[in-house]
């Protein structure tokens, strides 16, 4: 039986070796073509710092994801330029729960309501 096992293993090994040789034959012409192309065109290929387009975009400075980001940044710049308001207002927001006595009186509307008729 041991002879049978050895005989069975031998064809498997030879088929694996044949498969490797076939793979080498298939890839070797491809690799040969790659070597030829690289020798003809040495500048073409993956660059370590990424593509030229990406490098150019990164050098330009801060860019915005969309128009919302642009408008938010623009609003922040305007807020920095505006002078701050004087602290004469003493409105309290969120410190306590308002009661009807705490609320200021409602001002009458300048426009007459169509419903009041």
Swiss-Prot record:
InterPro entries reported in the protein's UniProt record: Endosulphine
Phosphothreonine PTM sites in chain numbering: 99
Location of the region described as Disordered in the Swiss-Prot/TrEMBL record: 1-54, 77-117
Subcellular location: Cytoplasm
Top-rank taxon, per record: Eukaryota
Changes after translation: Phosphorylation at Ser-67 by gwl during mitosis is essential for interaction with ppp2r2d (PR55-delta) and subsequent inactivation of PP2A.
Phosphoserine modification, residue list: 28, 67, 109
Keywords: Cell cycle, Cell division, Cytoplasm, Mitosis, Phosphoprotein, Protein phosphatase inhibitor
Pfam families noted in UniProt: Endosulfine
GO MF annotations in UniProt: phosphatase inhibitor activity; protein phosphatase 2A binding; protein phosphatase inhibitor activity; protein phosphatase regulator activity
Sequence similarity: Belongs to the endosulfine family.
Oligomeric and partner information: Interacts (when phosphorylated at Ser-67) with ppp2r2d.
Function: Protein phosphatase inhibitor that specifically inhibits protein phosphatase 2A (PP2A) during mitosis. When phosphorylated at Ser-67 during mitosis, specifically interacts with ppp2r2d (PR55-delta) and inhibits its activity, leading to inactivation of PP2A, an essential condition to keep cyclin-B1-CDK1 activity high during M phase.
Protein name listed in UniProt: cAMP-regulated phosphoprotein 19-B
Organism: Xenopus laevis
């Amino acid at each position: 039986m041991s002879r049978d096992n050895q005989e069975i293993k031998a064809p498997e090994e030879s088929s694996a070796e044949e498969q490797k040789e076939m793979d080498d034959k298939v890839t070797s012409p491809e690799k040969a073509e790659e070597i030829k192309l690289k020798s003809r065109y040495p500048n073409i290929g993956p660059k370590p710092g990424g593509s030229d387009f990406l490098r150019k975009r990164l050098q330009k400075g801060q860019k915005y994801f969309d128009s919302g980001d642009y408008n938010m940044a623009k609003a922040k710049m305007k807020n920095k330029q505006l002078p701050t308001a004087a602290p004469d207002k003493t409105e309290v927001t969120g410190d306590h729960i308002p009661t009807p006595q705490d609320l200021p009186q409602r001002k009458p509307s300048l426009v007459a309501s169509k419903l009041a008729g």
